[in-house]
From Swiss-Prot:
Any Pfam family hit: Tetraspanin
Protein name per UniProt: Tetraspanin-17
Gene expressing this chain: tsp-17
Keyword Cell cycle in annotation: no
InterPro entries: Tetraspanin/Peripherin, Tetraspanin_animals, Tetraspanin_CS, Tetraspanin_EC2_sf
Protein species of origin: Caenorhabditis elegans
Predominant location: membrane
PROSITE patterns: TM4_1
Signal sequence, renumbered to the chain: none
Gene Ontology cellular-component annotations: axon; dendrite; perinuclear region of cytoplasm; plasma membrane
Role this protein plays: Protects dopaminergic neurons against oxidative stress-induced neurodegeneration. May act partly via dopamine receptor dop-2 to negatively regulate dopamine reuptake transporter dat-1 activity. Also plays a role in modulating behaviors linked to dopamine signaling. Confers protection against oxidative stress in the whole body.
Length: 312
């Protein structure tokens, strides 16, 4: 007695094609998760909400994306093998994994939207204030985190401004001030911004006062080199101004010095990452729904026959 299967010819092709797409989607999930976690220009915003004590973390979206991608690389084989062999068991398992991926994608998009609203306006300021009062001395990891993320938050512009005015470029022998100075230089270099609200934040800052005292030049610098428009080959750790003299002029235009404050850039940066997660999450979820429907239709079309052959 032999077992034969037929049915669902076109659906087999459709599910096979979807399985290949599923692998590509898996690679996309892995890339997105690694990009958000490892890119030094992006991962600090994920750490921004890592201190939340009672709520889920935005960082969970990146990990969910990474885990889903790794799982999908394996699950894609189930769909392809199930379609080729007309195996109801493999296809059913594939559908169950698709449902799980669908729920994870929806969770990723929803969680991102949740944090977009949660940390807009003054909500982040409330979080920082609560963290400072209640946890600054209690949890050992909060102290260095708070010391370095005060200026990450676009909704507390005055805190950013205070850091620029009081800690940037002064007493860099102290680890905290050195770290703050390096970060602000990187932020201004990569995001093409200057200060918190604008270049004028550096006027009358402690950095400006210290350069006035230490400089042997006729005119001491008014703005950091990282605020200037850079030439080709410059880096965040070795900024090279297109025209340092013109950059230092009070009325310098955008051709020579960045005019936008970094708080505004951070707001755009944060929203960009949120919408990447939202678009990828919900877009992938819709595609998973298509795969679920195709696989279920193929399962219903498969016919199994038990053939008895008489051998003479």
């Amino acid at each position: 007695m032999a077992t034969e299967r037929d049915g669902g010819g076109c659906l087999r092709v459709a599910v096979s094609i979807f399985s290949i797409y599923y692998w590509l989607s898996a690679l996309g999930h892995v890339f997105l998760g690694l990009w958000m976690l490892l890119d030094p220009k992006r991962n600090y915003i994920l750490d921004l909400v890592h201190f939340s004590e009672n709520d889920p973390l935005l960082k969970a979206s990146a990990y969910v994306s990474l885990v889903c991608g790794c799982a999908q690389l394996l699950v894609g084989f189930l769909g392809l093998c199930g379609a080729v062999n007309r195996s109801r068991f493999l296809l059913l398992a594939f559908v169950m994994f698709l449902i799980g991926t669908f729920l994870a994608d929806v969770a990723m998009g929803t969680l991102s939207l949740f944090y977009k609203d949660k940390f807009s306006n003054n909500y982040m300021g409330v979080y920082l204030k609560n963290l400072t009062y209640n946890r600054y001395s209690r949890d050992r990891w909060v102290l260095p985190l708070m010391d370095t993320i005060q200026f990450y938050v676009y909704s507390v512009k005055e805190n950013v401004r205070e850091i620029v005015k009081s800690k940037y470029g002064v007493m860099t022998s102290e680890p905290e001030n050195k770290m703050v100075t390096e970060f602000i230089d990187k932020l201004q270099f990569y995001e093409k911004c200057c200060g918190s609200l604008g270049p004028t934040d550096y006027i009358s800052s402690r950095w400006s006062q210290s350069t006035n005292q230490d400089s042997e030049e006729i005119e001491s610098p008014l703005f950091p080199v990282s605020c200037c428009t850079q030439i080709t080959g410059a880096s965040a750790l070795n900024p090279l101004a297109k025209s340092y003299a013109r950059c230092q002029q009070i009325g310098a235009n955008r051709q020579w010095r960045h005019a936008v404050g970094c708080s505004e850039r951070l707001m755009s940066w944060f929203n960009e990452q949120i919408w990447i997660f939202v678009g990828f999450g919900f877009g992938s979820a819709l595609t998973m729904m298509l795969g679920i429907c195709l696989s279920c239709c193929l399962i219903s079309k498969i016919r199994i026959y038990h053939v008895i052959r008489d051998d003479y």
